[in-house]
């Protein structure tokens, strides 16, 4: 099939994809917090939302829209600051309401599965670093002169989503084991809220002040 890269390229891409997917970021912090807040269903709902966001980025990149965004300083900055503001909003919610880790029996994960899904979706849609990932990382595994370059680009985008979903699903499954222990220690949960807020704030600052693209 012409849209499939060579086995060597696929192996190199898979190895890089696993390392990238396992690197902590705002989305992984969100998966953990939603899992501890409402159990696996909320963790997987947030994961589904984040993967939907990656799918949107994949389509945009395959159509060339991501390259246009990356080339436009104003558009890039607009998305960058919108993403930073959203991360700060999540940090504020964790500090003000304990929304990051409100356990079952105390109101669930705050807003139900739909909210967990939407939060995961927005955390990836408003991250311009993902745009740059798709326009700088994926092309390294594709020959620009290949007649099937667009199809291979789309295939690798889907492959990265599959890798990310698998890695983070395993992390969510492991995190779910700590739910019972967390319920027995409300103070630890509050400290996790503080940690979550700190992480979101740090990611927001890094995103807003990153400057270079």
Where are these regions (language model features)?
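Hydrophobic/aromatic residues within the transmembrane alpha-helices of Major Facilitator Superfamily
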Residues: 18, 22, 55-59, 92, ...
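Juxtamembrane transmembrane-helix termini in multi-pass membrane transport proteins
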Residues: 2-77, 136-156, 161, 175-179
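Selective transmembrane alpha-helices of multi-pass membrane proteins
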Residues: 71-100, 167-171, 181-213
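Kinked, hydrophobic transmembrane alpha-helices enriched for aromatic residues
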Residues: 126-139, 199-206
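Flexible cytoplasmic inter-helical loops of multi-pass small-molecule transporters
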Residues: 96-113
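Alpha-helical transmembrane segments and their lipid-water interface positions
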Residues: 49, 53-65, 87-90, 131, ...
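Anionic-ligand binding region
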Residues: 108-121, 127, 138
């Amino acid at each position: 099939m012409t849209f499939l890269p060579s086995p060597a390229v696929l192996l190199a891409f898979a190895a890089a994809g696993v390392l990238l997917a396992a690197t902590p970021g705002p989305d992984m912090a969100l998966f953990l917090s939603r899992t501890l807040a409402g159990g696996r269903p909320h963790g997987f709902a947030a994961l589904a939302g984040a993967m939907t966001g990656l799918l949107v980025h994949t389509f945009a990149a395959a159509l060339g829209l991501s390259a246009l965004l990356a080339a436009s300083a104003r558009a890039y900055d607009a998305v960058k600051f919108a993403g930073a503001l959203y991360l700060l909003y999540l940090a504020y919610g964790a500090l003000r309401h304990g929304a990051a880790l409100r356990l079952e029996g105390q109101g669930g994960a705050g807003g139900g599965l739909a909210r967990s899904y939407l939060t995961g979706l927005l955390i990836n849609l408003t991250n311009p670093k993902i745009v740059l990932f798709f326009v700088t990382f994926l092309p390294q595994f594709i020959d620009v002169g290949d007649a099937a370059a667009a199809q291979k680009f789309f295939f690798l985008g889907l492959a990265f989503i599959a890798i990310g979903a698998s890695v983070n699903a395993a992390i969510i499954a492991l995190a779910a084991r700590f739910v019972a222990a967390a319920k027995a220690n409300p103070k630890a949960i509050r400290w996790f809220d503080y940690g979550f807020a700190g992480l979101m704030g740090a990611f927001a600052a890094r995103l807003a002040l990153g400057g270079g693209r």
